[in-house]
Swiss-Prot record:
Residues 1-50 form the signal peptide. Its main location: virion. One of its GO terms (cellular component) is host cell endoplasmic reticulum lumen. This is Outer capsid glycoprotein VP7. GO terms for molecular function: metal ion binding. Ca(2+) 2 binds at residues 177, 228-229, 231, 301. It comes from the Viruses. Calcium-binding protein that interacts with rotavirus cell receptors once the initial attachment by VP4 has been achieved. Rotavirus attachment and entry into the host cell probably involves multiple sequential contacts between the outer capsid proteins VP4 and VP7, and the cell receptors. Following entry into the host cell, low intracellular or intravesicular Ca(2+) concentration probably causes the calcium-stabilized VP7 trimers to dissociate from the virion. This step is probably necessary for the membrane-disrupting entry step and the release of VP4, which is locked onto the virion by VP7. InterPro entries: VP7, VP7_1, VP7_2. It is found in: Virion; Host endoplasmic reticulum lumen.
Length: 326
């Protein structure tokens, strides 16, 4: 019995020593082959000339400089562009493949397939409340309507800037605007806004707080009204609350990755004159109205000039989050 155990142990020991010897031999052979191969390459290298397909960059200097055979990174190769258009555009064009056609045309301007998104809206006023501006660059096409000239100017102000808003309870409280960035924004099917400024004793200045007919009317039957009153003065408000909502808003700053293109109209709507618009960068443009195909062709042709007036937003952002917070 003990003899069998000794024999088994001896067998394992011999196998282990044999395996160790074989592995050492294999390592020596591989070393010999590798070293010989490297030696041959070293000898033949000066005699062989081959094309270098790599990029030869100097060790020193700015990596932003353009070198021969290097690849430049363009804005549109790493960015997304959203083009927002009214529903009537698709209705007039009446072509199921019109977006594919435009995508191919955008490629000629350096925007690859998949980087341009076409987004339809039904009503510009509703769109301005919840614009969903997710792309790095966002271009909004807004057709001019002479009957809504002031509304369009205010809609552009909403789209091109970020706002922080809170509901107003005008039945219980007086309100005042703290500075030029503080506005009251009213929206609805019909907004009539009346105000009564108050003195330090909460008595009306030129009006009676108990009689709304003596209030000063500053907006009449408008769908959108951005109200600006004298800063630092309490006001009692009267608003047609059945058809309108009013909110106390603060302009946080420009959405620099958004541009508005006015389609048609004799004059371009200019909101840069507003002292709260800073920096004074023009991101409001106009295209002569003919047909929607002509409008889109013009946008494609000048897309890179339009983008140059904007700043890329590096992260996706639900812009509506800046509008109404309770």
């Amino acid at each position: 019995m003990y003899g069998i155990e000794y024999t088994t142990a001896l067998t394992f020991l011999i196998s282990f020593l044999l395996l160790r010897y074989i592995l050492k031999l294999v390592v020596k052979i591989m070393d010999f082959i590798v070293y010989r191969f490297l030696f041959v390459i070293l000898i033949l290298s000066p005699c062989i000339k081959a094309q270098n397909y790599g990029i030869n960059l100097p060790i020193t200097g700015s990596m932003d400089m353009a070198y021969a055979n290097s690849t430049q990174s363009e804005t549109f190769l790493t960015s997304t562009l959203c083009l927002y258009y009214p529903k009537e555009a698709a209705t007039e064009i009446n072509d199921n493949s019109w977006k594919d056609t435009l995508s191919q045309l955008f490629m000629t301007k350096g925007w690859p397939t998949g980087s341009v998104y076409f987004k339809e809206y039904n009503d510009i006023a509703v769109f301005s409340i919840d614009p969903q501006l997710y792309c790095d660059y966002n271009v909004v096409l807004m057709k001019y309507d002479a009957s809504l000239q002031m509304d369009m100017s205010e809609l552009a102000d909403l789209i091109l800037n970020e706002w922080l808003c809170n509901p107003m309870d005008i039945t219980l409280y007086y309100y005042q605007q703290t500075d030029e960035t503080n506005k009251w924004i009213s929206m609805g099917s019909s907004c009539t806004i009346k105000v009564c400024p108050l003195n330090t004793q909460t008595l009306g200045i030129g009006c009676l707080t108990t009689d709304a007919t003596t209030f000063e009317e500053i907006a009449t039957a408008e769908k959108l009204a951005i109200t600006d009153v004298v800063d630092g003065v309490n006001h009692k408000l009267n608003v047609t609350t059945t058809t309108c909502t009013i909110r106390n808003c603060k302009k946080l700053g420009p959405r620099e990755n958004v541009a508005v293109i006015q389609i048609g109209g004799s004059d371009v709507i200019d909101i840069t004159a507003d002292p709260t618009t800073a920096p004074q960068t023009e991101r409001m443009m106009r295209i002569n109205w003919k047909k929607w195909w002509q409008v889109f062709y013009t946008v494609v042709d000048y897309v890179n000039q339009i983008i140059s007036a904007m700043s890329k937003r590096s992260r996706s952002l639900n812009s509506a989050a800046f509008y109404y917070r309770v």
